[in-house]
Amino acid sequence: MKKLIAIAAVVVATIAAQAQGTINFANRGAFAANGTDAKVLGVSGAPLDGAGFMAQLYVGASASSLAAVGSPVPFRTGAAAGFVSASTVTTGLAGGAAASVAMRAWDASTGANYDAATTRGSSAVLSVVLGGGGSPPAVPVDLAGLAGFSLAGAGPANIPEPSTVALGLIGAGALFLRRRK
């Protein structure tokens, strides 16, 4: 009886376990697609440097359904500025499934995440087949075709200007006050 329960538990655990798709989140050298570098630059054109800038991988079944996966990671410093440390990210999609992915980066001083930041940038959306499927699980997929990109600021805030009527009323008021003296 104990053997039967143990076998049933193993079968249920095996059925319940679903392989998750995996991606190598990297934009430099051997860890990036085809050994190419995809440096991320700031608004000034300088490579992003240090924890003041963050990057995160966005994945979805289609380009219109991209959602953040994994944790935001800071950019490296010094000669490696503009690049993130390579890591494996597990997605919410099944291994072996087709997916759309993009790398997004932002200035952490302008917002806590990509959506909140006013200085931010995104790579082009890439189509990949996720790793992690099969038995044994396939190796994580590289970001084949990832190209470098730059951050863009929101620009100066729009300052509303007074309407013509308001300017006319202010001018008339000034003339009225001047005339009273």
Segments from the language model and where they lie:
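Short, threonine-centered small-residue motifs that mark membrane-proximal processing/anchoring sites
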Residues: 2-21, 150-177
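Mature extracellular "passenger" or substrate-interacting domains of secreted, surface-exposed proteins
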Residues: 21-158
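Short, charged juxtamembrane terminal tails flanking transmembrane helices
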Residues: 179-181
